């Protein structure tokens, strides 16, 4: 699933500075394959284009080129912090490679994670019984709970 180009509206540049470096998945005409990105002000940074990040010792090759963040998210928090620290250093010194930087208007965003299975715990019998007890004082499920979906 993708959004249309420019769907990340400008005007929120102040939310994306050195202290807020989020990870996402994007593509563009120059980067046609969805891959890991971050946002800085009104620009998107394609992480796979930054050679300094490839030198991070425990970062497996091609992790930042994947079409989802699953592989990156599975890594220890220390790796995420190291990526952010490298990015902060590069941004402070204005030494990001130009090929990694694209204006927000040219970007297509993609779903960041592949989620093959999903369970909504709020639909479970345990949750329904706990919620019932919290609201009414007694543990009971609605008469229709086992016959139709909750929601």
Named regions from a protein language model:
Residues 33-39:
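A conserved glycine-rich beta-strand in the N-terminal activation segment of trypsin-fold
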């Amino acid at each position: 699933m993708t959004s249309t180009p420019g769907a990340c509206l400008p005007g929120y540049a102040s939310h994306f500075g050195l202290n807020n470096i989020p990870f996402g998945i994007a593509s563009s005409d120059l980067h046609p394959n969805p891959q890991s990105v971050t946002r800085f002000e009104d620009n998107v940074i394609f992480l796979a284009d930054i050679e300094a990040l490839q030198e991070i010792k425990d970062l497996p090759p091609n992790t930042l080129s994947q079409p989802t963040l699953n592989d990156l998210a599975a890594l220890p928090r220390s790796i995420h912090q190291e990526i952010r620290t490298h990015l902060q250093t590069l941004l402070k010194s204005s030494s990001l490679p130009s090929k990694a930087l694209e204006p927000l208007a040219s970007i297509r965003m993609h779903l960041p994670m592949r989620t093959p299975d999903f369970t909504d715990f709020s639909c479970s019998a345990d949750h329904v019984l706990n919620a019932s007890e919290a609201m009414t004082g007694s543990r009971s499920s609605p008469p229709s709970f086992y016959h139709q979906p909750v929601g």
